[in-house]
C-alpha cells in the first residue's frame, strides 16, 4: 500500500452538503473558511441535468476537524478521496473547485487521472514562490500577498473580527466564516495549501480539459500566474468582467456555460 493510499484509508469521510439531481456527476469543492453555500447560484441550474455532489472541506462547514490534522494538501485531498470513494461512482466526473477548492481539485485530478473527465477551477489563488519569479514587479506583488497572509495568521482577533465585518457588509453569509471553531483549519490550510503550493505542476500533470474561470476584479489573483497556466494546451481561461473572488452571478454564469454550453443560464 502506498503512503497516499494509507492516508486515504485513515482519512475521515467529509460532509456531503448536497447530493441532488440525476445524470452525469459533478463534484463541487468550496474554498477556505467557507462552505457549500459558495455554489448556491450554480447548484439549482446544474441539478436540472446532472447529479450534483457538494462536499465540504476538512475542518469547514459541517465536516470533521480532527485534532491531529495538519491540514496539508495531501490530508485535504485524502479526505476528498475517501468521501468520493464512499459514493461508489461508476463513471468519471466533472470536478469544480472554488478558491482553495480549485487547488485541491487540481491535485485530485493529478492523483486520480482516470476519475476526472474535466476540471473547472474558479478563482484559483495560484502563486509561485517569490524566489522563483524573475519579473521584479510580479515578485513584489506575490511577496505582498505572502506578507498579508502571514499577518492574517498571526493576528487572530483582527482576522476573525474583520472577516465577520466583511461578511456582513457584502452579505456573504456562510461563504466567508472565520471563527474560533475553524481557526486552526483556516490558518494551517492557508499556510500549507495556499502559501506553499504546487498547483502549476498539478495542472500540468492533469490529463483532462481544464477551464479556469476568474474575475477581472479578483483581489487574490497575482499578475503573471494565469499567463503561465494559460499557455498549457489543455487549459482554457475565461475572464469574467467586473467580478471579484466570490461566485457571484457573472462568475456563476460562466461556470455554468463551461459545463453546459449556451443552454445554461441564471434568472
Regions found by a protein language model. Give the residues of each.
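Active-site loop/oxyanion-hole signature of alpha/beta-hydrolase fold enzymes
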Residues: 54-96
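Short glycine-enriched nucleophile-adjacent loop
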Residues: 102-113, 119
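Conserved alpha/beta-hydrolase "nucleophile elbow" surrounding the catalytic nucleophile
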Residues: 30-32, 97-102, 215
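Conserved alpha/beta-hydrolase catalytic His-Asp/Glu region
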Residues: 121, 130-132, 149-205
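Conserved HGGG/HGGXW glycine-rich cap/lid loop of the alpha/beta-hydrolase fold
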Residues: 18-62
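Flexible "cap/lid" loop of the alpha/beta hydrolase fold
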Residues: 110, 118-148
